[in-house]
Every structure is written in structure tokens, then in C-alpha cells.
Amino acid sequence: MEYKKFIGLNDDTIKIRTSVFIDEQGFKDEFDEIDKTCSHIVLYDNEKPIATCRYFREGENYHIGRVAIIKEYRGKHLGNKIMQIAETEIRGKCKESKCVIEVSAQVRVSEFYEKLEYNAVGNIYFDEYCEHIKMVKEL
């Protein structure tokens, strides 16, 4: 399994996110202005794109988001893998002694992020129809 980094959207990122967030979960506004300039990671299995996420800095903190694994590859710890890659990339860019990463997690998968040592802060809010919670981790 290998990964590649991209600045801005590419076809593989679009394909994975469309499959997961639009086709499966019914989101309508999946792509935004941030996608044009942020970093994206794509995991590949024999050149097949299977997982993606994006990360970017906003103010003092970094954000990881749009974590998506195609259906047939779920349950293989690829979410852990892509989050570790993103955190390593952020750690390399972080100039401060402490580095805070924020995630806007779907409430239904917040336990996944808790296992990666992210803590929920604030209240549940809606992104389109789906409950989300802000979660943070200090590196």
C-alpha cells in the first residue's frame, strides 16, 4: 500500500469522496473552496485509489477532514493509517511547541477519533442533515 500527496483536488480524491459522501451518505455540498488549496492524501492499493483525507492550517490550528475509505476497504484500519500519515505531515510543518489538530467529526464515527486521542469540544451541530462534533488533539 502506498500514498501520494497533492495540493488541490485531483481525480482520485474526487472519485473517493463522491462515492462515500455523495453517493453513500447523500451530502450535496461535498466540495468547497478549501479543496483548491489544501493538501490531500490518497492511499492506493496496487494503483487503485482507496482512501483519502485533506488537511490545512487555519489560524493557529490545523484541520484534518473529509476522511473517506471506499466501502470494500473498510474494516482494514485504513482510517488509522491515513490519519497517522496526515498527523505526521502536520507535525513536520508545525513550528510551535504544541500543535493542535481539529476534526469536524460525524457524531456516528466520533469513537474512531476518540481512539486516536481526539477529544470532543463544544456542542453537536449539523452539517447539512448530519450531526457533527468538533474534536481536537494536541501533538
Question: Model segments located where?
Answer:
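Short acidic/glycine-enriched loop/turn segments that link adjacent beta-strands
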Residues: 36-37, 60, 127-131
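Conserved acetyl-CoA-binding loop-helix of GNAT-fold acetyltransferases
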Residues: 69, 75-89
